[in-house]
């Protein structure tokens, strides 16, 4: 790939970097500690990677070099928790008087609406 029998020549590297700049390309090394790529079913984790960003006419390309570890993706578990809402006597009276229903009906509507006065009134109004 490199002229000169494949041996690395630092002067040649400087010439290549100058040519890249002339063509509107710029490369910069980033001091990354860890890179994680999230796939559908797993994670790829690069510890101590070499990361280089190349800017070519405004488009940035990131190059990651290093050894990747495949890590199982943990499912985020959200548990359904039943919350019992305390319904105040004041709220029950308000819903009861607004809708012309008994206090028991007003309390039930408030509990079903998780204490939301407006929702309980709308529910009883229909």
Curated annotation (Swiss-Prot):
GO terms for molecular function: RNA binding. CDD domains: UBA_AeNAC (cd14359). InterPro entries: NAC-like_UBA, NAC_A/B_dom_sf, NAC_arc, Nas_poly-pep-assoc_cplx_dom, UBA-like_sf. It comes from the Archaea. Keywords: Protein transport, RNA-binding, Transport. Signal peptide: none annotated. PROSITE patterns: NAC_AB. GO terms for biological process: protein transport. Residues 10-77 form the NAC-A/B domain. Homodimer. Interacts with the ribosome. Binds ribosomal RNA. Contacts the emerging nascent chain on the ribosome. Belongs to the NAC-alpha family. This is Nascent polypeptide-associated complex protein.
């Amino acid at each position: 790939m490199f002229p000169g029998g494949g041996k690395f020549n630092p002067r040649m590297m400087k010439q290549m970097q100058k040519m890249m700049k002339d063509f509107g390309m710029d490369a910069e090394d980033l001091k990354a500690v860890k890179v994680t790529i999230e796939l559908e079913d797993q994670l790829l984790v690069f510890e101590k990677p070499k990361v280089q960003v190349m800017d070519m006419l405004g488009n940035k390309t990131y190059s990651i070099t290093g050894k990747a570890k495949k890590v199982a993706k943990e499912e985020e578990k959200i548990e359904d928790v039943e919350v019992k809402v305390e319904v105040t006597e004041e709220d029950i009276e308000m819903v009861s008087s607004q809708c012309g229903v008994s206090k028991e009906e007003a309390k039930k509507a408030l509990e079903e609406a998780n204490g939301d006065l407006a929702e309980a009134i709308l529910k009883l109004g229909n």
